[in-house]
């Protein structure tokens, strides 16, 4: 779960603490944002996180490996209009990899070239816009964001990624709304790094992606491991993401407080 306070101790600052666990992932994060760091609305934020992911523990076939990530960063947001802002960030992240029971050949080849432990420093620049009528459970308006992130000199690996996310809420009646959403991404290595780190690959599938499919179960398939040549190809991800969908949103029957729950057909 997570705890978020938008007016921490009456200061106007936002503090969030998240602790989530699943069968294959543990995620701990902390963030602090001063939304009015300057009088003209420039925001300043800090964050720290620890994430442990072990795909070996999933009950269905995905590429077998685990990665422990520890990092933190600082970001500055600058408003350019009432509905949009620019964001700039710097972060540091340490990743430690472990191979699993049936690690596929693509992973073993990357580890042979680059090793298992990496420390990377990243810079990011982004633009975001929102005209949503509310922050949660919106029923009209749109939001979108575009972010470019790249490792910088001093990093063990060299790669970048460009991500776009957008959604539109189109009311049909007072109770029924169509939601159109899409996520686009492109990532690539550069310089001395010969290929994109496999753990930076894009996947699809799952509740927040392509519903009806298991988490991270969609995407390019791997080469079977040499230790198990009869193994069927497993989802390995790729450096390009194109996904989208349409949902029909309407109030959940027999629920009095409609501000926290609603039904979605997809």
PLM segments and residue spans:
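C-terminal outer-membrane beta-barrel translocator/porin domains of Gram-negative envelope proteins
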Residues: 1, 101-266
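Gram-negative/organellar outer-membrane beta-barrel architecture
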Residues: 1-145, 178, 208-212, 216-227
């Amino acid at each position: 779960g997570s705890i978020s306070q938008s007016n921490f101790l009456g200061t106007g600052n936002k503090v969030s603490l998240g602790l989530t666990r699943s069968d294959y992932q543990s995620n701990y994060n902390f963030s602090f944002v001063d939304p009015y760091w300057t009088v003209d609305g420039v925001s300043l934020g800090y964050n720290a996180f620890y994430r442990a992911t072990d795909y070996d523990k999933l009950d269905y076939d995905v590429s077998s490996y685990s990665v422990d990530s520890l990092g933190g960063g600082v970001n500055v947001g600058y408003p350019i209009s009432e509905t949009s802002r620019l964001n700039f960030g710097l972060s540091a992240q340490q990743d430690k990899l472990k191979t699993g029971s049936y690690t596929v050949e693509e992973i073993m080849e990357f580890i042979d070239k680059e090793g298992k432990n990496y420390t990377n420093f990243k810079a990011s620049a982004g633009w975001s816009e929102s005209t949503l009528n509310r922050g949660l459970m919106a029923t009209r308006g749109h939001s979108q964001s575009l972010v470019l992130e790249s490792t910088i000199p001093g990093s063990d690996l060299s790669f970048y990624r460009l991500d776009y996310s957008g959604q539109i809420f189109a009311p049909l009646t007072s109770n029924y709304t169509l939601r159109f959403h899409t996520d686009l991404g492109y990532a690539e290595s550069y310089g001395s790094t010969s290929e994109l780190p496999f753990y930076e690959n894009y996947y699809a599938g799952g509740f927040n992606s392509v519903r009806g499919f298991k988490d991270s179960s969609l995407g390019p398939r791997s080469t079977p491991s040499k230790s198990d040549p009869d193994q069927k190809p497993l989802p390995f991800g790729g450096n390009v993401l194109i996904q989208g969908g349409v949902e029909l949103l309407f109030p959940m029957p027999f629920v009095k407080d409609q501000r926290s729950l609603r039904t979605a057909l997809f």
